[in-house]
Design a protein with these regions (language model features):
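AMP-binding/adenylate-forming catalytic domain of the ANL superfamily
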Residues: 130, 505-527
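Conserved AMP-binding/adenylation subdomain of ANL enzymes
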Residues: 187-227, 232-277, 290, 294
Length: 543
């Protein structure tokens, strides 16, 4: 059996056809239904002229349809393409054009944007509309359920581990780029993650999967996962769905389109969830508030099934982790550090196992390299760029120059340099400083925003914070904190600056503080530094 998502999932569907694979609100799909519906979609794609390496774009909110359409693309050896549902016309057109998309599956509420760009996308052969109450805006679109009903399931294929898998970056460091992987490498990585979560060793070969899945199922120990982050980004999709489905588990997606802590906890309770995947403090705090509110009204949530919470992509502070453990003490909290371009390391926090914010155990294949090409010595206090080895992509789709800059060979080993900087502690752990393109140069000193954000959020009354640099005649750039406060907080600029100076060197402390009602973040919780910088510039009287 080849290591390929579609092939592994087909073997699971054959082994446990009647077990639930997908849940969205009241809609539940068994593994047999999941497999059959994806096979019908694959047949529809092929009937429209798509085939091996064809790109199927998914302009969808979280839900069963996202995963079914993705599986359908995998089945025909196509390439599913994630599309940010926040994109407006030009962003949408850019990504679909750049990806060479031949099919587009979209929620009808997003149809007005689709209608305005499709005439500029001559490669699009097929449009499939998922009805969410606002249909009929795209004349050429076929209804999702009609497409499934109109096609018999596609016969299963022999696939190659060399097939391309691709995920588009969020565009936080420029225009979105498609990061390409061998699907065999990608599936192998995530095949290794789900089984330890249910107490089993990972399979050494995909042919072992059906027997392991049967063992898990018979023991009543299936991995039920809730991705609270959007499936259009790697954290929600990879950690929230691939990990569970490769172990024969179920994925429960939320029906709300903005994060509601009560919905997350209620869904975890009702589905006996084992795993919740989220993104940092911004997604954890609403869960903590919801837990407390339910307890105060005398109707606490039963979260006894919950074993693990995984976060990736942004800062997850020690203080917030401890608050979560105070309420759900049996949890293992896994803070994974990495990017679309590669995995770097992780941090585990449990009751009795403390952790330090931004300090991670690095993967054995991770190095930190100085500007002159040396490996950073542990305990030296030198700063270097993180080089992630092991799981390294093929490159960026249609961008050989950026591929050559990002994916480099050192001493015969290929590494990914995504732009993250770190120090190496004496014990070999990584002290993450942040993304290099966000570094603030103030008075000749380099200031990493994440370090200042962490310190700012420790000041009583601060709910959230982003730190940016604003042009300054004296310092070049002035460190500026964009801050939102907790309800009823009585905190001013001087208190925040003083609070940071008690924790960090004076040159790192904000010189200005801009107060906003809410910190700008993407749906996956990642920082929107562009908007934060605009807030800071506006406050300083600059455009």
């Amino acid at each position: 059996m080849e290591t390929h998502y579609a092939t592994i999932w087909e073997s699971i569907a054959d082994e446990i056809p009647d077990e639930v694979a997908l849940v969205h609100g009241s809609t539940r799909r068994t593994w047999a239904e999941y497999d059959q519906r994806a096979a019908r979609l694959a047949a529809a794609f092929c009937a429209a002229g798509l085939g091996h390496d064809s790109k199927v774009a998914l302009f969808l909110y979280n839900g069963n349809e996202y995963l079914e359409a993705q599986y359908g693309a995998f089945k025909m050896r196509g390439v599913p393409v994630n599309v940010n549902y926040r994109y407006l016309d030009e962003e949408l057109w850019y990504l679909l054009d750049n990806a060479d998309a031949e099919a587009l599956v979209f929620h009808s509420s997003l149809g007005d944007r689709v209608a305005r760009v499709i005439d500029r996308l001559p490669k699009l052969r097929m449009l499939i509309e998922v009805d969410d109450g606002a249909g009929g805006q795209v004349d050429r679109a076929e209804r999702y359920e009609d497409v499934i009903a109109a096609h018999e399931p596609m016969e299963r294929l022999t696939r190659s581990e060399d097939d391309i898998y691709m995920l588009y970056t969020g565009g936080t460091t420029g225009m979105p780029k498609g990061v390409m992987y061998r699907i065999g490498d990608h599936a192998s990585l995530f095949l290794n993650l789900g089984y330890p979560a249910v107490g089993l060793a990972a399979p050494s070969d995909p042919s072992e999967v059906p027997a392991l899945v049967r063992q898990i199922t018979d023991a009543g120990n299936r991995l039920i996962s809730i991705p609270t982050a959007p499936l259009m980004h790697g954290t929600g999709l990879w950690l929230g769905t691939f990990v569970a489905h490769l172990a024969g588990g179920a994925v429960v997606t939320l029906t709300g389109r903005s994060l509601d802590g009560h919905e997350v906890l209620r869904t975890a309770q009702d589905n006996r969830a084992v795993l919740v995947v989220l993104v940092g403090d911004a997604m954890t705090k609403p869960l903590i508030r919801a837990f407390d509110e339910a307890a105060e009204r005398g109707d606490p949530y039963d979260l006894s099934s919950l074993k693990m919470v995984i976060s990736s992509g942004v800062m997850w502070t020690t203080e917030v982790k401890e608050e979560l453990l105070d309420r759900i003490p049996q949890l293992m909290l896994i803070d994974a550090i990495g990017s679309t371009e590669g995995s770097i390391g992780s941090q585990v926090t449990m009751r009795g196992v403390a952790s330090e914010t931004a300090r991670f155990a690095s993967n054995p294949t991770t190095k930190v390299i100085t500007e002159d090409g040396r490996e950073v010595e542990p305990g030296s206090d030198e700063i270097g760029m993180i080089a992630a080895g092991g799981f390294v992509p093929i490159g960026y789709f249609k961008d050989p120059e950026k591929s050559a800059r990002t994916f480099r060979v050192i001493d015969g080993v290929r590494y990914s340099f995504a732009g993250d900087f770190a120090k190496v502690a004496a014990d070999g752990s990584l002290i993450l400083l942040g993304r290099g393109n966000q570094v603030i140069n103030s008075g000749g000193e380099k200031v990493f925003p994440e370090e200042v954000e962490e310190a700012t959020k420790r000041v009583d009354g601060v709910a959230d914070c982003l730190v940016v640099g604003v042009d300054d005649e004296r310092f070049g750039q002035a460190v500026t904190a964009v801050v939102s406060l907790a309800p009823d907080a009585d905190v001013d600029e001087a208190m925040i600056i003083a609070g940071v100076k008690r924790q960090l060197a004076g040159f790192k402390a904000p010189r200005h503080v801009v107060f906003v009602p809410q910190i700008p973040r993407a749906p996956n919780g990642k920082a929107d530094y562009k908007t934060a910088k605009q807030y800071a510039n506006d406050a300083a009287g600059r455009s």
